[in-house]
Amino acid sequence: MENATIVERTLLTSDLMILKIKPDGGVPSFLSGQYIAIGMPGRAPRASHLPPEAEQPTDLDKIIKRAYSIGSSPEEKDALELYIAVVPTGSLTPRLLCAEVGQRLFAAPKIVGTFTLADVPGDKNLVLVSTGTGLAPFISMIRTASTWEHPGRRITILHGVRHKADLGYQEEIYRMIAAGAPLDYIPVVSREEPVADEFKKGYVQHFLHDGTVSLDPARDHVFMCGNPAMINEVESLLLDRNFTVHSKKQPGNLHVEKYW
């Protein structure tokens, strides 16, 4: 069942990491915004400093699986990059926290999901709203050349976290902006006070309510990934502003990743 290898592991904080994994058969084809299930057996060591897991595994050989959005571009064929927050009482992430480079693990053979840009017309701007590791699919999108192939398209990223140390990928986003990408970035921190203008204080939904980000259903497609409370509030706000939820049967301009 273990069919992939951890090839890189970066700990951003004590409970936030970037993991790169290489499936034995190579990186499968996928679209930015999709996710993959990975897992480790219950017998794998778990971080000892964390509280006991909420559900003890009864079969130590059974693979504990969870799904994670992919942060790497589909153009990257060496490995898949995952942005992972440790859940202290969880079953998988405390085991991933113990894993070292070279560790074997399970990776689903297929990458799936409908939270992609496939149905977005090229003349539409993108507003990408996330909290925590919900940023991952948007990093994949902005790393992918085809996202930028549409003249006049502008992309806005709002990323909400508790502490500024949790603003993963901030430096990469700023480098893209400095290089001339038509990209706006609004980092939002809820539990620290900003120094100068390094971030905004509060919650991402506040900066959609107050007009910091101008939204027009005729011009913009909004994508949301992260905390369900944020998603519900933003969805309600945008439905009142004549946005419509996208589905396979009914195309719209409001795209929601329900997994959390």
Question: Where does each model-flagged region fall?
Answer:
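Conserved beta-strand elements of the Class I
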Residues: 126-129, 223
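Short, surface-exposed secondary-structure boundary micro-motifs
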Residues: 41, 110-111
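Ferredoxin-reductase
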Residues: 1-100
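Reductase modules of NAD(P)H-dependent flavoproteins
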Residues: 156-260
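Generic structural signal for buried aliphatic residues
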Residues: 36, 105-108
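Ser/Thr-glycine-rich phosphate-binding loops at phosphate-binding pockets of nucleotides
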Residues: 131-137
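Histidine-anchored nucleotide/phosphate-binding helix
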Residues: 137-148
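A short, basic/flexible loop-to-alpha-helix module at the beginning of a structural domain
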Residues: 111-121
